[in-house]
Regions:
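Glycine-rich beta-strand-to-loop/alpha-helix junction loops that act as flexible
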Residues: 216-219
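Alpha/beta enzyme core
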Residues: 3-14, 24-51, 58-76, 82-211, ...
Length: 243
């Protein structure tokens, strides 16, 4: 079986993206996994801090490892939206394949410092346990909800989108493997319709950073927006609310 990073590279070269789906129960896991197998595509299962606490950190690792080993199938486990080094460390120590460190509410330099700490720890653990571990970080405001909302949250707009310059600085300063930028996407779904995505910003950020990009807040977005952003450099798409 190829590595996590190799599957991401394959998706990039083919102009595709890997689906990342959050779960909070066994039924959802099996539904997502069975569809992935039917389509013969790799899959990423995500657990936020709250979902991880509900499902169980060790239980989630055991479930994913069992499916991957038993079926020899590319299914990976991601610690989605973790808000401290300590939270990331606990997930990686338990056996998660990757983690998203989300510190967008902190000043940029403090964000960089803690994100770099996560990257360095992941590298050390990867060598110690001889397994691949990826670190992703979010940059720019994307909102925080996983619900159906009446309107787009205040503060979300073009002015809060990630710039190529900030993305380049952040990636070079931290050494992250994956970046989740703000490109018009917002977590959650909206009764008024989701905002449009900006593939031109995706392209500019990808060219500036040279690393795979991740689209968060995919629930409710239009198919044509997905396709345009994937062609521009998105390699992973997150879906949660819509499930």
């Amino acid at each position: 079986m190829k590595t996590y990073k190799e599957y991401i590279q394959d998706a990039d070269e083919k102009g595709n993206a890997i689906g990342h789906f959050n779960i909070s129960n066994l039924e959802t896991l099996h539904a997502i996994y069975n569809v992935a197998k039917k389509l013969s595509v790799p899959i990423i299962i995500g657990l936020t801090e709250r979902e991880e606490a509900f499902v169980g950190r060790d239980e989630a690792v055991a479930l994913i490892k069992t499916l991957r080993t038993r079926d020899n199938y590319p299914i990976f486990l991601n610690a989605d939206h973790h808000y401290s080094f300590e939270a990331v460390k606990m997930s990686l120590d338990a056996g998660f394949d990757s983690a998203v460190i989300d510190l967008v509410k902190l000043p940029l330099e403090e964000n960089i410092k803690i994100t770099k700490q996560c990257v360095e720890y992941a590298r050390e653990l990867s060598k110690k346990e001889n397994r691949e571990i990826l670190i992703e970080a979010e940059l720019g405001f994307i909102g925080t909800s996983s619900k159906i909302l009446d309107k787009i949250p205040d503060g979300v707009g073009e002015v809060t989108m990630t710039t190529p310059e900030d993305a380049k600085h952040f990636v070079e300063a931290t050494g992250i493997d994956l970046l989740a930028p703000s490109i018009g996407n917002v977590h959650g779904m909206f009764k008024t319709g989701n905002p449009r995505l900006h593939p031109e910003r995706v392209k500019a950020i990808r060219e500036a950073t040279g690393i795979p990009l991740v689209l968060h807040g995919g629930s409710g977005s239009m198919d044509e927006d997905f396709v345009s952003c994937i062609k521009a450099g998105i390699d992973i798409v997150h879906i949660n609310t819509e499930i």
